[in-house]
Amino acid sequence: MKVRKKEVEYMNEKIYEFDAEIKKVPDIDGAYVEIPFDVKEEFRKGRVKVHATFDGVDYDGSLVRMKTPCHIIGIRKDIRAAISKQPGDMVHVTVKERA
């Protein structure tokens, strides 16, 4: 009988909090913020599912690299409308890993 070892996935419980400038995605009506820390070091993986807030508005998304020098998280148009902010504005962000 073969016994498989199940890897225990690491889950980071820390809440990260920072202020960031909203950046514009070139050629489309998209926006994102850059993550100001080393995501691979903090979460032990490259793409991370997170629960985030932008000025207190909830969002579930992922920290990703999209041909950018660092990880980013997108800010949907409806969230930008809800917080009345656009590219160039500063936003308060919280990020916590989710399962």
Q: Where are each of the predicted segments found?
A:
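Long, compositionally biased stretches
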Residues: 3-70, 87-99
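Beta-strand/loop nucleic-acid-binding surfaces
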Residues: 73
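Short alpha-helix capping/helix-loop boundary micro-motifs
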Residues: 76-81
